[in-house]
């Protein structure tokens, strides 16, 4: 599992967190994250690109992207609203995995594994759509 490092491709033109093509899954502990990553790897659902985000990483790298924009770009605010949810959970010690989304079938298989561990939120970032996977 890779450590997360924010990249421009994970941001909107406004600079807000929006990792298109990824599932963003928050779990209550590092133990749950490791259990999930192991299940994904053993089922060949992890291509080695799954990223771990500790609560500190979420607070330091993801949270500051909310509200970076000025008034020059329109937005419905969904991106910032999601980041605020992530912030609240990170403050409680939750961490996250970012998993490549792939096809609908791949996503279903990943979510079958996600549901084997306690998880707090699961979102799939697609082009122009954040899909709630709960």
Residue ranges and their predicted role:
Residues 1-134:
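Positively charged, small/polar-rich N-terminal and surface patches that mediate targeting and assembly
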């Amino acid at each position: 599992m890779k450590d997360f490092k924010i990249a421009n491709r994970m941001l909107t033109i406004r600079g807000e967190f929006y990792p298109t093509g990824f599932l963003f899954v928050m779990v209550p502990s590092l133990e749950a994250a490791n259990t999930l990553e192991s299940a994904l790897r053993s089922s060949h659902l992890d291509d080695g690109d799954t990223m771990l985000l500790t609560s500190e990483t979420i607070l330091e790298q993801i949270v500051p992207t909310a509200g970076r924009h000025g008034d020059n770009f329109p937005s419905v605010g969904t991106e910032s609203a999601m980041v605020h949810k992530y912030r609240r959970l990170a403050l409680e010690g939750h961490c996250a995995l970012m998993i490549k989304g792939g096809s609908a079938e791949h996503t279903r298989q990943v979510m079958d594994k996600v549901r084997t561990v306690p998880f707090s939120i699961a979102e799939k970032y697609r082009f122009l759509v954040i899909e709630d996977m709960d």
